[in-house]
């Protein structure tokens, strides 16, 4: 039997698998990206503060009965935080391409529904979730067609009136060709729907600056982050009634 040539989708999924395995095997040292590093802590606090502010702004603070999905959940760190925000474990679902990450997530919080799979083929029924979210997912995907398929799936499983929440890099990393900048224009094009409302804000001080400043002068790093001029990430919600 003649073997079919690999499609663009196959090649991109294979590249992502290789990239994530490299990261998890030591390409991203814990001492630099763990919360004991001041720059990482600044990033984490900024993300959480703006995430909660957005949910409050969009009247999404009563999470007890809401169904929540994270696409590209990794080991589930961010999804687990929603327990502190009032979400029930049985109403939270996470899916990730990497089986070993999901195994870790299940060991840390078995009450959440964790699935191994790709965001372009979500194993959920239409209109299943009140909140569908991703964190630093789309900037890792270099294939435009795969990004589009994942966006379509996120729309498909979102309930009418539900929110799509995205957090990602705004700019490409010149030192890392595996990262694509997700500008607001690119996000709008990717999730374009008639009547869709986009509410995005610029967050997270540029990592080179925060690494140089945060450990020496936390107040200065925090002030620079609040000024937003040197911020490199975006977070926001998309709503469609």
Feature names for model-found ranges:
Residues 185, 189, 200-241:
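A C-terminal cap/extension of S-adenosyl-L-methionine-dependent methyltransferases
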Residues 161-168:
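Conserved beta-strand signature within the Rossmann-like core of class I S-adenosyl-L-methionine
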Residues 120-132:
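A short acidic, Gly/Pro-enriched loop at the edge of an enzyme's catalytic core
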Residues 148-160:
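A short glycine-rich, Lys/Arg-flanked "PGG" loop and its adjoining helix->strand segment in the class I
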Residues 69, 75-121:
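Class I SAM-dependent methyltransferase SAM/SAH-binding core
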Residues 44-64, 81:
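Conserved alpha-helix/loop element of class I SAM-dependent methyltransferases that forms part
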Residues 141, 171-189:
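Acceptor-substrate binding/catalytic loop of class I
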Residues 1-34:
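N-terminal, positively charged/glycine-rich alpha-helical extensions of SAM-dependent methyltransferases
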């Amino acid at each position: 039997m003649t073997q079919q040539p690999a499609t663009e989708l196959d090649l991109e999924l294979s590249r992502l698998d290789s990239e994530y395995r490299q990261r998890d095997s030591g390409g991203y040292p814990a001492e630099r990206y763990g919360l004991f590093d001041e720059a990482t802590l600044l990033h984490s606090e900024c993300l959480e503060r703006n995430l909660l502010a957005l949910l409050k702004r969009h009247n999404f603070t009563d999470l007890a009965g809401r169904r929540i999905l994270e696409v590209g959940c990794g080991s589930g760190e961010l999804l687990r935080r929603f327990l502190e925000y009032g979400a029930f474990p049985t109403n939270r679902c996470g899916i990730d391409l990497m089986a070993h990450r999901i195994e870790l997530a299940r060991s840390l919080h078995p009450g959440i529904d964790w699935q191994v799979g790709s965001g372009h083929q979500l194993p959920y029924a239409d209109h299943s979730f009140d909140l569908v979210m991703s964190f630093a997912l789309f900037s890792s995907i270099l294939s435009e067609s795969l990004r589009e398929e994942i966006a379509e799936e996120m729309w498909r499983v979102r309930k009418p009136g539900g929110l799509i929440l995205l957090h990602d890099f705004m700019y490409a990393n010149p030192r890392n060709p595996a990262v694509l900048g997700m500008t607001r224009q690119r996000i709008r094009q990717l999730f374009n729907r008639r009547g869709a409302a986009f509410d995005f804000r610029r967050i997270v001080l540029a990592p080179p600056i925060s690494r140089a400043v945060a450990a020496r002068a936390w107040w200065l790093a925090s002030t620079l982050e609040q000024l937003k001029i040197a911020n490199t990430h975006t977070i926001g919600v998309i709503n469609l009634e």
